[in-house]
Structure formats: C-alpha cells, structure tokens
C-alpha cells in the first residue's frame, strides 16, 4: 500500500491526477486535497499524469509515502489553437476546446476524416453506422442530437466536405465544445463547431514527401453459424412439434454431411485499402507554398463494392510588402461510390439493413449455381438456379446491375491580410472570399434477375439437383418489367465573403 500527495510547482494540490501502476490497469486518482492511496505489487513503478503537466514515472521500491510535484508542459500550453476569431495559446483559453494533431491520423486506413478521429477528442462522440466502403461516421459533441457546424479554413462547409478531406492535407482539427468557444458563429453553432485548418507552406527549401500504405482485414467469425445438416435437423424438429412425421431421412443427412451452400462464400470478400499521397512544401521570405495530391482506393467487404477518392490542394501565400499578404488556397476532390443495385435500401444509404436481412439466414440446402449436369458450383459464370426467396442475391450482386455515384467539389479561397500597426499597434484587417462548385452524378443500371428453375434429381430427394431444364426460366426484376438505366445529375455552387477587423494587445 502506497500513499502520497500530488502538487504543482506552486505547491497547490492537483485534483484528479492519474496514478497508474505501470503495465497494469491498476490505478486511482487524487482527491480534492491531491492525496491518493493505492495497492501495488512489489518493486512496482507508478506513472503520474495530468493534462497540461509532464508525466512522471516513479519506482516504489523501498518507499511507501510519496510527495510528487508535477511540472507544467510548457510546450503544450504554448501551443497555438485555432478558435472562431483567430488563434490563442492553450494556456489563455477559458472555453472548452479539444485539439487533434493529424500526424497520428495519416496512416490510418479509413475512408474519411470522421472515421480516423474516433476516440481522439474528449467529449466528442464519433460512431460508425456502416461497414460499407466509403461510409462515414456521425459526430456529436457533448451528447448533442444534431451535427456540429463545420468550418474549413474559415469557410462554413457541410459534413460531406469535411469527410472528403485527406488526412495528409490537414494541419489540425479543433472541436469547440461550449457556448463561449463557439459564440462567434451564432445560433448555427448550438451543437458545437469543428474547425479544420489545412496545411500551408513553410520557410524552407522545397521538401518532397511521398506516403503510401496498404492494409487488408478479415472477418473474425463466420456470418452463418449453422450447417446444412443442422438445418435439416431443425426442419425435422419443427415437423415433430407440429405432430407430423420427420420429412428428411438418413439419405439426405448422408448427402449433406460434407457440403453446405453458404451465401457468404459468394457475396463476401476480405476488404483492402491502399492510400497514396504526394506533397511538396517550401518557401522563402516572400512566397510560401504547399501542393498535394492524394488517392484512396477501398474495396469493401461485399463484392462489387468499392470507394475511390482523389484529392488535390494548392495553398500559396505571398508577402507583397511587410504589411500586406495574399493567400490563395485551391482544392478539389472526387469521390466514386460503386456498388450493386438493391432498391430496398436508400439510394445513398450506407445502412443496407434490408440486404443484410435478406441474406443473413439464407438456407444452406440449395445451391446458387450449377453446371449443365446439375452439379453444384460456386462459379457465378455458371448457371444460376432458383432460390427459396424467389430472387437470387449472389446473381443480383455479381451480375445484376449497379448503382454508381460520383461527387466532385472544387473550392477556391482568396484572402487579403493588412497590418494596420503603423496607425494602431496590434490592429489588423482581413478580407476573405470563397467560391465552390459541386456536382453529383448517380447512375443506376437494372438488369433482369434471371435464373433457372431448380430441378431435383428425384421426387423423393428434392434438395439433390438434377440436370438443368433450360425451358424452365424465372425472371425477377427489382424495379419494373424491363431492364432500365437511370441517371440523375445535380449541380450547385456557393460563395461567401468575410471581413475581419482584429485587435490584439
């Protein structure tokens, strides 16, 4: 048992400091007087930490009472944080702000910025709603029920523009969590503000940087936890419960003892992600520049599901005089979401619950594809046969059409900064103009879902397939009585003009 007290450099108690036994989850926090007690192992080492202070690791060997002084992390406190009306040092901020540096995010194989930020800012809930390629996450600040306001380089944008950013081009992300911090944005900031600052040029020789990554993943467990023989046993038990004879005998159990038709073998795959980013950063006393190109390619867990994103950014600033500066920030992105056609979930809905419902408990007793002699195969180039649902999910996914959506966004920001210090010391003014062009193109192509009627080998063994009868055809169309193609195009643009007058003393 060890006891002690944690104070700062002035001798004031630190309330809520963390004391953790290194290498374990055993720990405690200091009380209102800075005191603590903790049971630890022999010769243990404890780690003492608190936000804004430098961590300390202390050996407990030969000692049971500790007086610990934590020193301020001056580097963290001097760090500049972007707020609604400019920048401030962390030590001067009284409002509630959480900051995330993006160096740690750049190698995470996530499809968008929302997903990479999960768990990295206190008071910010980031929840993924779907595992489809390109799917985003919801962001809620301090338990609010609506989206926060998104501000990118001083321009109010929507969640889609935030998600379209490449983590490599982002300098930092700040979450303004209370009314005092977000007040400059008015009522639209009632659910908090997410402030994003993209990278800019620095005073150095041209520095070229190329980053690439590749990752893949697999399921930790099978989606269907039953076999064909277990399904036969279940159906027999249902019949007995209803007072009927068991419909399936030993011959079928013998036939299925080494085979099961798993729909997931045809519709699921191991997803993969590759990312590439090329940038150049440099500048002189007069001009600074940052140029970047990004590419993200993601293959989803379902076949025929993928997401691609292309990004570019050009951020150039020039000092016309010692007091007058111009900055031009041009960026663009294109996002391609491609997937199979399934009309019973929303056109832009990443929560494909109806598809999941339709495939989750699919029978293990019927093959999906056979050759001409009726031998079961897993080859989608073979002959599709009718399933119990009246439609053919693998054929729909692999050969039944598509729904492809493309988004493109081009944004230009120009800013003029003038230092008026020769008239009033600490006075500056800025004018910022912004224009964006956006388009969306959604194309859906629907094919007939064609299959052949399942032919059993005999009337007594209805699950054992026989040769295909090519005169017995079934067609299930998902939208109408004919094949069709549909295309929707949306075009929009926006502009914004801001004027700032700042005084800092």
For the regions a language model picked out, list residue spans one by one.
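Surface-exposed loop/interface segments of Gram-negative outer-membrane beta-barrel transport/assembly proteins
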Residues: 202-260, 300-307, 311, 315-409, ...
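Short, solvent-exposed loop/turn segments enriched in Ser/Thr/Gly
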Residues: 113, 409-411
